[in-house]
Swiss-Prot record:
Annotated keywords: Amino-acid biosynthesis, Arginine biosynthesis, Cytoplasm, NADP, Oxidoreductase
Record's protein name: N-acetyl-gamma-glutamyl-phosphate reductase
Molecular function terms from GO: N-acetyl-gamma-glutamyl-phosphate reductase activity; NAD binding; NADP+ binding
Reaction catalysis annotation: N-acetyl-L-glutamate 5-semialdehyde + phosphate + NADP(+) = N-acetyl-L-glutamyl 5-phosphate + NADPH + H(+)
Subcellular location: Cytoplasm
TM region(s), chain numbering: none
Taxonomic placement: Bacteria, Bacillati, Cyanobacteriota, Cyanophyceae, Synechococcales
Amino acid sequence: MAGGGQGRVAVIGASGYGGLQTIRLLQDHPSLTVTFLGGERSAGRRWSSICSFLPLPEDPVVQSADAERIAAAADYAVLSLPNGLACQLAPELLQRGVRVVDLSADFRYRSLEQWSQVYAQEANRLSREDSELCQQAVYGLPEWHGPAIAEARLVAAPGCFPTASLLPLLPFLKQGLIDTDGIVIDAKTGTSGGGRVPKEAMLLAEASESIAPYGVIGHRHTSEIEQMAREVAGQDVRLQFTPHLVPMVRGLLSTVYARLRDPGLTAEDCTTVLEAVYRHHPCVSVLPVGTYPATKWARHTNRALVSVQVDTRTGQMILMSAIDNLIKGQAGQGVQCLNLMHGLPPETGLPLQSFYP
């Protein structure tokens, strides 16, 4: 239904953070309308009894995620489900002609074998036989895969850490300006990145007034970042990635360290590289040399703010990126993909300016 009038969207996992953000973003969208709310724990309940803070017209009832019902109500489905669930529903939707944007990690890997290794806990309780579908899925980073997303039946939206890290990094890998070994990514995110299901580490008493690393070796997003980096660089890329939990609700800051192959390159040169790549992408803003992004600047927007500095003493390039982890890092990026699939400019209906402070 690309570009053909109002697009009907089903949001599955509607009461989780990703689902809530998707619904909120689509409330004011000129060309996409939410026509189906799906969920298992909330099935059968009126929306107002679950999320009274986000009123919806006619107070719809959340329904179970039945593929037949979804296909009758929607042209597109956004799956905001825990890992290991979307891969069970997506094939049924695709068979019925529903185009899918998956916010989980189920289809982010080209290889089902690699997904099974990285997401071993989920793989142990599933019997997946959809390796062909994994290969067909388009990695939903709109600034890099826009034309493919527009034609895709199944889009796998990237994780929040990969989004914030890849956007500043990929232009330099593409042009061969940095070494592909020794890349270090240091990232910080707020507590909403852990989802809406209660977790001990996300309790106020645990997270407040504290910063802590987690997943120090082998975090799941490491291999996801490496996969995309490898495809763009055309060679193997190995990097070190360490995330940190910081005491704020939303926002993500990624700092990437890489060694320049040409020690004569300046911060101005590197900024020009970023500007050339993202000049026509309104959801990415390249900051002037010496201006470094803050998460508050991106809060509640679908913008990624990127900046670069060069340490001439060490030959290191420092890339910085700030996003809202729930918008550009999740639901907003999903809507970007929906826009492309519906034949619209990717930024349609998405907030690009924050309220400050």
